[in-house]
From Swiss-Prot:
Species assigned in the record: Deinococcus geothermalis (strain DSM 11300 / CIP 105573 / AG-3a)
Keywords: Cytoplasm, Elongation factor, Protein biosynthesis
Family classification: Belongs to the EF-Ts family.
GO MF term (any one): translation elongation factor activity
Predominant subcellular localization, coarse grouping: cytoplasm
Name this protein carries in UniProt: Elongation factor Ts
Compartments where found: Cytoplasm
Amino acid sequence: MMESIKKLRELTGAGMMDVKKALADAGNDEEKAIALLRERGIVKAAKKADREAKEGLVRFVVDGNRAAMVEVNSETDFVARNSDFQALVEQVAQAALRAGTNNVEELRNFTLDNGETVGNAVAAAAGKIGENLVLNRVAYIDAGEGEHVAGYVHSNGKIGVLVDLLGGTEAQAKDVALHVAAERPQYLNRDEVNAADLEKEREILTNKALNEGKPQQIVDKIVQGQIGKFYEERVLPEQKFVKDNSVTVGQYLGNAQVKRFVRFEVGAQ
């Protein structure tokens, strides 16, 4: 009995009394006792679900031309730096790659090698760690022939990026991932810019110029120049390249083209 208690405590991180009760309830069957402890961990986690989880980590995994990235949130940065939590996030990222999904709910329901779902693994970890943990986001890229996939995670694990580059080199894909992390582009190209947002920006700039007493005949020219700056600040190929601001990202890439980028920042949507 004591050997089983010791073993289960090491495997689950649960307290002695919790392990003893689980073993008793499971008729000393260790596997059933572990299942009970996980279930009870899930109950504890559910009670914490009303607490906000705004800290956490981003992790990515690249395997050839496939890549996945996840964001898992915790309540405190202290837990985000916990080795058990970091191992959980790594496990979830690996699962996301195998699941091949961009859908959080699909990933939650994906079954791990040990037979439990990703969602249950996160909930069990929440019970063990003692904080509300949330699988917040997932991204998956399956690149085609002639494409390069790269990822970047800032050293503190709070910002992560995936990039799918058509043409060019793997080094360029990695450079763009670093750029996206630092410069926060909002759009892949001008066509992605919301027409209503652009019109609102144009209206604001027009009224600003008129309020400053600019002559009507030059207002349109002024606004057009400022709209150009709007694109330069938000559209990836038009941004100044972070590693060499004498060129834009588009100029740096030449004939290569970013097909997709994903940027996660912990606590931001």
